[in-house]
């Protein structure tokens, strides 16, 4: 029986670094102290696009070229390309079309864009893995996630402006006879917060017709802790139905949105610190690519090795939670 493994992973981020002091000073001028906020979120610095020629698509193209080189492959070797983003550079054509052209993929390569907000790349990898298992003609897939978050971050709201960074991550999935790779995934969706995080703030129609601001995300306050009980339930179910316990997990690549969330999950399951891959102090929050940048850094540092069981967890606005098990 075939399995789907992560053959290679690579990333791209801009060179420009902004540290916390910039944002502390920015909000002090507005009469607000955000130092505690930055501690809770676990921020120190972030990579931010500062060149007009860079955007979410260019980051994705660079990450794609890097992962193909790492895998020893070309665009001709790909059967499937999926671009995950919540900040597409274009809607016509899809961004994956530009990836296809840049790497000169074949005419029979399947391409698509997808958007599950911050849960996007995890959803894309999970669903591509299942599709590859079902389709005998698909042997390799490129999943690239890229968000130009600073483009639409709201300078009046620290939850985006001081919290986000820009980056892209690309993975190559490969069908294999090895006893490794994709294991399972679980979802929980509750639409209770569907009107709390909006871009465009009042919908595309009003933005295009000039009746609403299109410049920034509008983020209204809500209690994100409500997502934790279903998180514990779905992780418990995911582990149980695959005959695993939390002690069988070798590494945790969670959403880097807030360090406080990671610490709560870690405390709930009593996960050893060395198993928690945290990169939010370096990259800040990169949106769709967030758990996979953690995977990349875990592999790079030697904390994640071939054969390790990796638990992914992330959340998309609205909200949708995704947990996924992969044997790297």
Could you tell me what each predicted segment is?
Residues 6, 52-116, 238-262, 266-268:
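Conserved beta-ketoacyl condensing-enzyme motif
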Residues 6-8, 37, 67, 78-81, ...:
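Buried hydrophobic positions in well-ordered alpha/beta secondary-structure cores of metabolic enzymes
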Residues 133-167:
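Flexible, glycine-rich active-site loops centered on histidine and acidic residues
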